[in-house]
Amino acid sequence: MRRIIYSIAWIAFATVTLCCNPEQRQDSDTVGNGKEFVAGKPDEKEVASFLADAIRTRYDEVKLAELASLKSSNLDILSFAQDLANGHTNSLTAFQALAEKKGMSVPRQEHEETKETINELSQSSEKDFDERWCDKILTMHKKSIQDLKTMSNRTDDAELLEIINRSLASTQSRFNKLQKLKNNLP
């Protein structure tokens, strides 16, 4: 009798764990800030969270581009960093304007984690800096591409879609350029 009760309890526990574990659910995606977005149209909180993360990410990359312009002597890195800063400043402005238009709060600085990353990277030797900087930007771009695609597939907001599509195209292009640049580092 005890075995049956334990078996039933174990099966119930396993069922609840699998059904409620977001990593096991097939109808969800994790976006940017680690918050889970369930399939379907995003609600206002999800859009606000997406926009806040997109804005902070653009601040992150502008700050990292500024660091590269100070720390690197590699002409390709310097050129890429300038393009990155210009492109993300434009994207940042577009995301901020949309968030403000929707009455959503707008972050005014980068993520705290990025401040720590900037501090760590600034301590790197010049040779190590270029490679570590490229790795960080590639990782950020990969995540950004995933977040943009996820929201693009979920929203029907025409203004948001327009900004996402522009940002997605430029982010993908920069990701590809930076991969090539990193592979050719001395």
Give the positions of each predicted feature:
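His/Met- and acidic-residue-enriched segments that coordinate or traffic transition-metal cofactors
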Residues: 2-7, 20-186
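Sec-dependent N-terminal signal peptides
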Residues: 7-14
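C-terminal motif of bacterial Sec signal peptides marking the signal peptidase cleavage site
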Residues: 15-19
